[in-house]
Amino acid sequence: MAAIVGIGAKLSLTSSDLLPGLDGAYYWVQVRSVLSNFTLAFSDLPLVFWIQAGIAKVVGNIPVAVRISDAVLPAISAIPIYLIAKNYRKPFLPAIAILVVLLHPVQLYFFTGDFIKNEATIPVVFFMALVLINWNKKSKRFSIISLVGLTLLIAISHFGTLLLAFMLVGAWALVQLRKSSLKFWLRGIAIAVAASAALMGMLAILVPSRYERLVNFITTPSAIFQNPAYDRIIHSPSISVMTIAIFIGQFSSLILGVITWYSRSKFSFSDLSLVISCLITTFIFSSPIIGMEWSDRLTGLSIVSLSIAAIIIFGSVEILWQKSLVTILAAVTLLSTLPLSTLEMKRVFSDQEYSDFKELASHVEVPNNSVIVARHGVEYLSAWEFATDVVLETYYESADVSSYNSVYYIQELGKTAPGMGGGGSKPEKPALGIGSSDKGGKADIPPNLPNKIEITGETIYSNSSFALVKVR
């Protein structure tokens, strides 16, 4: 029942034509490409898109399939959460834990529509936690094979969640194996290095842009602290879902850490190792000193490690004040969704603007071997409606578009840098095509890029909201 409530809450947020956030059409384009060409339109880790394509095959509608995946895939977390919580023989713990995770403000008001890959891989991390909790109950062969298999699932699904999994398992292993022999440690380090090298090699092949970002992060780790999240917290005129998540992550990890210390004798060794690992991960991932380019994603994922720790702690401690503190933290988390539910979720366009955008697309067909330039969010809708390659507006001046016969620009009238030119006639109607270019892929947008640039050309078609400008 708790899982059904979570699914219903997610579906209620995606009832409009456009998904919340800026990147919903990215998933539409990727799924269409999988169904049409058995490949992705933009380079990315493929598993979630293939699952969405399978759903689309069943329901016969790509946007509906993406909407279903947005609601159902995160709800799979209910299975491992139930299996973890039932170990502690607390009657209402499984249901409450499932509700807190599925109705968490980050789950509803940050992941929905925009970060489907992030939320879709969260259940796998809960399954990894289940394996670690049962480490001393199951055979080591079964546990290791399970961890390897689950890691591979994450590795072909989402890079950020892979970092979370490595952090959780790595910290757990450090606590578990701290009294092991030097030979055992050296063997473990060798295995970890080999696994990391293999995963980086796979990332370099599947998503070169993410591999380059990871290498840049390793070589210049100070970059992660540029434009720290606390600047946004201090200067923002209103509270945001991620500000709430940062406060919850920081304070909860400290409070739960104190409870764990006072009641450490009540935990099994495996449980204690996992709790310590989860609290360290939560505190680091939700830190406000992390730069905004990374902060939102890491803070969003920290709800997983925090939830795992809270379940184990509530199930293990016996003192009333300690249980009460965990209960209060869970209640605050759920109640924090109420003020956020009154706010309108950000979308690429209003309903009227989206109607005008589709009207524009219906009157113009873009020739083969063309690319459309548009602002973030609009580029994915352009790829969806015009079935062509796209490039992000803020990258246009540095992007190599020399291989394209034509370059077009989506001008939002009254919003972005104006185009120029007369009202040219519509082009002839050639066959449409879409390439597998990396341009326009779902990359992270650095916060210091200009919001708009001037792109000029000949207006091919316009309506009350948009103009299609031919740049060359």
Briefly describe each language-model feature range.
Residues 2-7, 28, 48, 52-57, ...:
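Membrane-embedded helix bundles of polyisoprenyl
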Residues 6-14, 23, 44-45, 116-117, ...:
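Transmembrane catalytic cores of multi-pass membrane glycosyltransferases
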Residues 15-30, 40-54, 61, 348-356:
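Extracytoplasmic catalytic/substrate-binding loops of multi-pass membrane glycan-assembly enzymes
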Residues 15-16, 107-117, 289-296, 345:
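Membrane-interface helix caps and helix-loop-helix hairpins in membrane proteins
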Residues 86, 139-140, 177-190, 253-281, ...:
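Membrane-interface helix-loop-helix junctions at transmembrane boundaries of multi-pass membrane enzymes
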Residues 104, 313, 325-349, 372-374:
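Transmembrane alpha-helical segments
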Residues 118, 163-164, 290-319:
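Hydrophobic/aromatic-rich transmembrane helices and adjacent perimembrane loops
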Residues 336, 346-355, 362-426, 435-438, ...:
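Short periplasmic/luminal acceptor-recognition loop of GT-C membrane glycosyltransferases, typified by
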